[in-house]
């Protein structure tokens, strides 16, 4: 059977050790882009490329600390991370990893605080030029592709 390896809570060294010593699909269930917000939990561009090379997913985490260095993040910050990954490796490697159950109230976004607010993200993706099939991939189809292989 195939396995999926989640590297979200791994150090960068552990990430690269995992790449070197395994062949399974890599996912970051709830991580963002280090080049936009240099939090140690976020992924470098090289890590994002390695995940894509293994046909994995980066699940965008909706925690202000991982989206924006200072202040409270909002949907615009999510879009910045999605655009960065899209430009770097393509739309097929982006999903959501909201971590709504793990984010303290003080680190929640100003406009998306729970699942009921997801239409805000969908509308912002449309305004940002994403097509419906691309939005569907981000909102769940990419995860279904990865999960169907185990």
Which ranges hold each PLM region?
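A conserved active-site cap/scaffold subdomain adjacent to cofactor or substrate pockets
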Residues: 52-67
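Short acidic/histidine-rich active-site segments
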Residues: 62, 89-112
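Alpha-helix N-cap and loop-to-helix initiation/capping positions
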Residues: 39-43, 73-77, 109-116
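Active-site environment of divalent metal-dependent phosphoester hydrolases
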Residues: 10-16, 33-36, 65-67, 102-104
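Acidic, His- and aromatic-enriched active-site or binding-groove loops in soluble protein domains
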Residues: 26-34
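Mid-to-C-terminal alpha-helical segments outside catalytic/metal-binding sites
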Residues: 113-150
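Conserved, mostly hydrophobic/aromatic
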Residues: 5, 30, 58, 99, ...
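Histidine/acidic residue-rich metal-binding segments in metalloenzymes
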Residues: 1-27, 40-55, 76-92
